[in-house]
Structure formats: structure tokens, C-alpha cells
Amino acid sequence: MLILLYNNNMNKSNKHKSKSPSFILELPLIVTVSDEHILNARLESARQLYNAVLGEALKRLSLMKESKQWQYARSLLRNNPDKSKIFKLCVEQFNFTDYDLQTYGTKCKNSCFIGEHLDAHTAQKTSTRAFKSAQRYQFRQSGKPRFKSKWKSLNSLESKSNASGIRWKDDHIEWNNLNLKPILDKKDKHGVQAHALQSKVKYCRIIRKNIKNKQRFYVQLILSGFPKIKTKNTISNDKACIDIGPSTIALVSKHDNIIKDAFLKEFCPNAKQLKKNIRRIQRAMDRSKRLSNPDNFNSNGTVKKGLLKWVFTNGYLRLKAKLSELYRILAAYRKTEHGKLANIVLSKANIIMAEKLSYKSFQKNYSKSVRDKAPGMFMSILRRKAENAGGNVIEFSTKTTKLSQTCQCGNIIKKSLSQRWHICPICGIKAQRDLYSAYLGLFVVNNNDIWNLDIDSACKSWNTAEPLLEKAMSNVIQIASSRKVPVSFGVKSKDRAIPSQSSVVMQRDSGCCNNKVSFIARA
């Protein structure tokens, strides 16, 4: 198993991190029963150290927020220069820094059995991990961090550098008298692994995964430089715009002001069968839980309030293991599909325009779609791959552009989410909503940090764009004839016709382009 990730640390504000670009090579490890016991003991020691440091960090954070200095700083206006100075003094006074909590973690390690299992650098990185969790909570970037239980244990450990602690030496991992050899890809037909192993190792990370109810251990080598791009993944130097939805993506690309390609796709289209299996197992688990604990439920089927004692049968635990495996498969499938789709997008263009969306809002309003399709994860993968290929993902504000409500003739009509087609009553243009928004996004320009739509350029390119948008919708209709497609595509049940059925060509006049154009729709 070979996984390559890319991380551009140029965008990180942490001054302690290296500012050079890095990428990750993940390799499975050959682990004996004895090695597995040692690794599990070290991960358990790290879990207990993490909980100890996290508890101390939350305690210091609580005392700091209760102090009079902190309350006074909060009462100051945001533009007051003394505000940040007082906050900084409070942090130093209550020892709520990464260095102070690393020192506390080192004392905990040296005062108990943890020192027999963890080296200094690994303990310091574990303490830093706990501090960052508390710091995110301090800045309201996440909720209150939870302690790691045995059932949700710590599954990764890393070192600070390749000089000590977890080290990659020659062709194996060395860690406190523990030597672990990886399983290398002997074929390596794209040369990705060979390129990675020739790069400088910054530090190493040990990962524990549960696959098919068995523990597997992997090493992640954080390497300096850029990963090798596979020869089959071609990169285009054109420009494109994408319109992202909770479960769909629309793309329109152009080359030298000539519209080149367009498509409308669904994220992870084959995830439906996995979701069906997950639902079946969840229903079976619920039935088992109700039969084993009849006294814990009210007459209407709801769970009783208060402290309850639950009994779980062996059958329930087996179903729980199957459910966990299905979720792992779904996550791996989703990540693979997003990587493939990102490569397809980059084969169309490496300069990609996109609306700046709130993916947290997607989570609140379309929770199931986001859980299964993860549009925010796709954008992060696309951004990483685009930067690696020398391109960029440019996000523009939706407040001034309003692409889903705007026509190229200048008419602005607010549409409901259920209205999936753009039909302009003034110029007569009809197009699928997502595709048309992606088309207009190609002509968004930045004027003094204000994004606006260049209507004249959009009108000039419409003659070449309309046939491509029609072709993209024709492909969607062909797919809809064989399987169900998302409702957001705007393809109704009557449009899911067999390919032999005739199509109706509707002639209309396009007012802004002053010529006759045709629109093909299924009868």
C-alpha cells in the first residue's frame, strides 16, 4: 500500500515548523507478535501522557480565563494595541505555552512508567498535540477537547526529527531498540516510491490502523520537496471554474478565451451500495440493543433518561466491528475518488476559479450528503494537487458576484434551491444552474479586491459555450437512463428515458447574442 500526500508548509504560521515544502510516503510495516506488543504499549503510554497534559492545559486555560487581567483585556476594543499585549502577558503568567506544557509532559514521563516506553522527542510531540487541542478550544476554532479513552485510543506517534526517536535509517525504522522493515512496492511502475525514498527525511510517524478487525502498522515518512507526478496524470495550463455543491461538481474550462470543455459530475457515485449496507447493519444493531435492554426504553421507543446499564451481546459486537469496517472502506473509497476527480479537473486546467463557500454550513444543512461525499475534503485535495502542479485554486466572494442569480444579460433574479435551471425571461437563455454558474465564474475579475462579473466577455463566449453545456447535460441524461442521479442535476424522472427515445429540439432566440441557438431536451 502506497499513499502520497503533499503539504505546503509555506502557508503555516507556526514559526517552529520548517517552511520548506514537504510530502508524505506511507509504507506498511512488517510487525511480529512481539513488535506488536511493544508498539501497543508505547501507544498506550502516549495516550496516558496525552490525557495528563491535556488535563493540565485545560486547567491552566480555565484559570487564565478567570483572571482579572484576562477579563480586562476582553473588555478592551479590538483596535486597542494593549489588548494583544495583555493577552500575551496572561499566557506567559499562567504558563499556557507549548514550551511550558512540553516541560510538564517531560516531568510526567520521567516520574512514572511512561519513561520506559517513550523517548524525549516523542513525549514532547505528544505534549504539543495536547496543547494545540486546548489552544484551538481557546480561540473557539473547535469544541472542548476530549480525553482519549481505551476504546478511542491514540493511534499515531511522531518524532521531532530524523536524528533521534523514531528514525528512518537506510531501509528500515529504528526506535528504541526496535527495528521494523517496511513492505516496498517492487514494481513501482510510476517511479513514485523511488523518487520519495531519494528525498531527505524530515521526521517519521508511526500509524496504527484497524483493517478487517486486525491491527496493521504503517510508517509515514515526511519528506522534503515535492512528490513525483505520475505520467498518466497530465496537467493542462488552461483556466477553469468549478461550482461545488454538497454532492456535485460542475466544471467549465477555456483556452485562450474559447470555451473548451464542460461536465457535471456526482461525488463518489458508487457509495450508495456501501450506504445501504451501513443502514442494514445499523438497523440490526438497534434491534439487538432493544432486545437485550428492554428496560432502558420507554413505551414509545425512546431511551429513558438518567444513568442506564447497557448489555451488548456478542452478535451486537460483531455487527459493530462490521460497521466500523464499512465506514473505513467508505472513507478510503471517498479519498480515492476525490483524488481521481482532482486529477481530471487538473487535466482540464491548473488555474481553477471557485466560489468561496462555507462547508460548515453544508454540514448543518446537508449533513448526510457531506458525511458521504465530503466536498470540503475534495477542495483541500484539489488545492494541494494544484499547488504541486504549479497551479492555483482562486476562491472569490459570492456577495458581489451572485453567479447562481445572475444572467449574462445583466438580469438578476433570486432563485430558490429547488429551481435547478437558469431561465432568463429577458434574453431567453436556458441552462442547468450549476453549469451556468461555472461558466460565468470564468469571467469573474478582481478590481481592487472586489470581485465582479465581466458581462461583455461572458456574452461574447456564449456561442461556443452553449453547445458544450448542452453536451454535458446530454451525458447526464444518458447516465440518468441507467441509474439514479442527484435531484440537484435538474433531471426529472421523465427525462430518464432510454437512449432509443427521440429528443425534441426547441428553437429559441438568444437576445444577448442575437442569433438562433438550439437546446436539446429529452422528450
Language-model regions: role of each:
Residues 37-40, 44-47, 51, 121-128, ...:
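Non-catalytic, well-ordered alpha-helical scaffold segments
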Residues 23-29, 180-186, 260-265:
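Generic detection of short hydrophobic beta-strand segments and adjacent strand-loop junctions
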Residues 2-124, 522:
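Gly/serine-rich nucleotide phosphate-binding loop at the start of the catalytic core
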Residues 15, 217-523:
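Positively charged, helix-rich recognition surfaces that bind polyanionic ligands
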Residues 50-61, 134-141, 248, 289, ...:
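A generic secondary-structure signal for well-formed alpha-helical elements
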Residues 53, 125-137, 435-445:
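Stable alpha-helical structural segments in soluble proteins, enriched in small hydrophobic residues
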Residues 21, 212-215:
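Short flexible coil/turn linkers enriched for glycine and charged/polar residues
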Residues 78-212, 372:
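Acidic carboxylate diad motif detector
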